[in-house]
Amino acid sequence: RICYLAPRDTQICAPGQEICYLKSWDDGTGSIRGNRLEFGCAATCPTVKRGIHIKCCSTDKCNPHPKLA
């Protein structure tokens, strides 16, 4: 699997990691910086705490930055 790890950077995921994810959350700075984002690979869709949104998908490069998609 190939997933984004940053807005424009991709990486081949480790064996067994077939899920790409994009987490987003408000870090309290409001509109100054917008939501914080975390990109990555995983074996299963990560469990997140309340207030954190996550998108999981299972095709190559399916977790792009929302503004670059």
Swiss-Prot record:
Family matches, as InterPro entries? Snake_3FTx, Snake_toxin-like_sf, Snake_toxin_con_site, Toxin_cobra-type
Enumerate the subcellular locations listed in this protein's record, separating them with semicolons: Secreted
Q: What tissues has this protein been observed in?
A: Expressed by the venom gland.
Q: What does the UniProt keyword field contain?
A: Acetylcholine receptor inhibiting toxin, Disulfide bond, Ion channel impairing toxin, Neurotoxin, Postsynaptic neurotoxin, Secreted, Toxin
Output the Pfam families linked to this UniProt entry: Toxin_cobra-type
Which SUPFAM superfamilies does the record cross-reference, listed alphabetically?
Snake toxin-like
According to the UniProt entry, its GO molecular function terms are: acetylcholine receptor inhibitor activity; ion channel regulator activity; toxin activity
SS bond list: 3-20, 13-41, 45-56, 57-62
Q: Name one GO cellular component term.
A: extracellular region
Sequence similarity: Belongs to the three-finger toxin family. Long-chain subfamily. Type II alpha-neurotoxin sub-subfamily.
- What exactly does this protein do? Binds with high affinity to muscular nicotinic acetylcholine receptors (nAChRs), whereas it binds with a low affinity to neuronal alpha-7/CHRNA7 nAChRs.
Protein name listed in UniProt: Toxin Lc b
Highest classification ranks of the organism: Eukaryota, Metazoa, Chordata, Craniata, Vertebrata
